Amino acid sequence: RAGARRESHRRPMKHNPIIVALDVPNATEALALVDRLHNSVGFYKVGLELFTAEGPPVVTELVSRGKQVFVDLKMYDIHETVKRAAARVAALGASLLTVHASPQVIRAAKEGAAGSQLKIIAVTVLTSFDQADLEDLGVTGRTVGEQVEWLAQRAIAAANRLPAGLHS
């Protein structure tokens, strides 16, 4: 019949690969977006701005609503600090956490996440960086692409050296 809506478009997908970035300044706006999207998306990214403004409660609220959470903080600090912070993010129920692609940072984050569902993503070079930015950091002799590849290879090598039980 004309004008009839097909309800099949409203059912949530069993696997939706989309992660929606909650790049908003506060939990009120973030949760309003989650409410508008309802069950069409089940995975959300909480970045530095929102996490700094609202803290861990924004992550636990999303998890309590049955959402998967990607905590995008790009951690880069000493071993024990990253290990403990990753453990705290894991305890919140988050699914993904970003850290710098240095072997020591990856190892620390994996130790902190051990025994949890938290997966670690290593960030090589920020997408906003260009050649001049790398040179400002003292990275010379490599293009942005080469730097990404070099850091990624180091991250993979570091992951391969992790003790059993810390791989994921």
Residue ranges, per PLM feature:
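Conserved anion-binding
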Residues: 14-15, 77, 81-168
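Short, basic, glycine/proline-bearing loop/turn elements
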Residues: 41-45, 71, 137-138
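Short, Lys/Arg-enriched N-terminal segments with co-localized hydrophobic residues
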Residues: 1-12
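Alpha-helix-loop-beta-strand connector modules within alpha/beta enzyme cores
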Residues: 57-71, 111-121
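Conserved alpha/beta-domain cores
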Residues: 22-66, 79-82, 151-153
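C-terminal alpha-helical cap/extension of soluble enzyme domains
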Residues: 9, 18-19, 40, 118
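Boundary/entry segment of secreted carbohydrate-active catalytic domains
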Residues: 13-24
